[in-house]
């Protein structure tokens, strides 16, 4: 009983997206499993919209996700985890591929591969906003429900995509990630959970995870 109250025994289901698969995520999971070997951990890949529904229903205990709209966030608790700079994902043969960094206005004539807004509204709206601030409205070549699909579409020559720099782990040999030099060309990653479903195991996990966050 005492071990349960200390969060050393139990189960934990963690939601994540492909945007949360940088080096920090495996490190957190490994550290938590090392310290709490009697906690059964389940990992579930989801889109940000799916995270919201799963947290509210109690299907998952915690999620690495994007900030929610204020109306959706009323029942959730958030902690900022890191700010992820955007990179432009493009073919190695692209004229801009060899540049050390670019401004988003240099992509004004490109077709954009975007996240499906129904699944990732924060990221979609951020890209649209960045383009508007640069003086243009992006030509949307295609949308995808996942970063892996976006990268596949770029590889197929369907356009360019803006993805967080941690997505570098996904790129193939034919693609490059070029950093964006624009101010505010980034998107936040948060840890979210539902206070009404909070338990000792969740608190133990938050203690481990939040020690590894990057402050804004």
Where are these regions (language model features)?
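Central regulatory/effector-binding core of bacterial HTH transcription factors
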Residues: 9-71, 144
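Short loop->beta-strand "edge-of-pocket" segments that line small-molecule binding or catalytic clefts
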Residues: 15, 86, 95, 102-122, ...
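Hydrophobic hinge/microswitch elements
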Residues: 47-60, 66, 117-176
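Extended ligand-binding regions for polar small-molecule ligands
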Residues: 105, 188-216
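Alpha-helical linker/hinge and terminal dimerization helices associated
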Residues: 1-5
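Beta-alpha-beta core module
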Residues: 72-79, 84, 89, 148-195
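Acidic, Gly/Pro-rich loop/turn segments at junctions of secondary structure
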Residues: 35, 46-109, 167-171
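Secondary-structure junction motif
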Residues: 110-134, 199-207, 216
């Amino acid at each position: 009983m005492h071990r349960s109250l200390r969060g050393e025994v139990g189960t934990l289901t963690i939601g994540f997206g492909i945007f949360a698969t940088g080096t920090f995520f495996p490190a957190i999971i490994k550290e938590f499993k090392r310290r709490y070997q009697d906690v059964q951990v389940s990992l579930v890949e989801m889109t940000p919209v799916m995270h919201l529904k799963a947290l509210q229903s109690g299907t998952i205990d915690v999620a690495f996700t994007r900030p929610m709209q204020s109306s959706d966030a009323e029942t959730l608790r958030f902690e900022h985890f890191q700010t992820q700079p955007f990179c432009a994902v493009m073919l190695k043969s692209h004229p801009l591929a060899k540049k050390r960094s670019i401004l988003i206005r240099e992509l004004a004539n490109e077709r954009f591969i975007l996240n499906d807004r129904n699944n990732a509204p924060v990221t979609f709206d951020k890209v649209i906003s960045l383009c508007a601030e640069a003086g243009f409205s992006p030509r949307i070549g295609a949308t995808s429900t996942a970063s892996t699909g976006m990268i596949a579409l770029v590889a197929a020559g369907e356009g360019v995509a803006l993805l967080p720099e941690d997505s570098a782990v996904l790129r193939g040999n034919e693609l490059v990630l070029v950093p964006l030099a624009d101010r505010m060309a980034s998107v936040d990653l948060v840890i979210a959970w539902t206070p009404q479903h909070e338990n000792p195991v969740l608190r133990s996990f938050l203690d481990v995870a939040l020690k590894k966050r990057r402050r804004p």
